[in-house]
Amino acid sequence: EESVRKVFAELGFPIIDKNSQRVLPGCLYEEDREACDSRTKNVAARSGIPEESIEAVSQWAVGLYGRRAPHVFENMMQCSQAAMLPPLIGDSGLPTAAAVFAIEQEWALSLGDLIERRLMLIFPPQLSLATLHDLAEILVVMGCLQPADREPAVLSEVKYLQDLYGKKIVTQ
């Protein structure tokens, strides 16, 4: 609490609650979920997500990002490089906006970082080669991967995921 008092005083922020009662960034209380989901759907639709995917994409984004979910899609709409990217990643049904957000706001710089730490794609039972290729393309477009390194990065990640996690990559 003493650190909070010092830092907040320096920043000119009011202290609202004690540490144990303060909301964490992205925290979404159940009573706020419906409003956040509604706003996320609206922003996702404006960002180009196909109508038939909006419900699933919104639920996934709110589940992963909490109250930051609408910002994921707003960030995509403000990113000039992202304008040339498709709205969904491969055949995953996940929004390209999430990968762009992870790169721009969470400093994801590699395929492994996107898959294992940012988008949590290591956990669903199916991960396709098409999804890996699209993620690599997003990294290229965003300037994090050289075009010549795209295919080697995908092949290296496939081997890594198989060796470390026993993850089979679907090629269809």
Regions found by a protein language model. Give the residues of each.
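C-terminal accessory subdomains/tails of enzymes that are appended
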Residues: E1-Q172
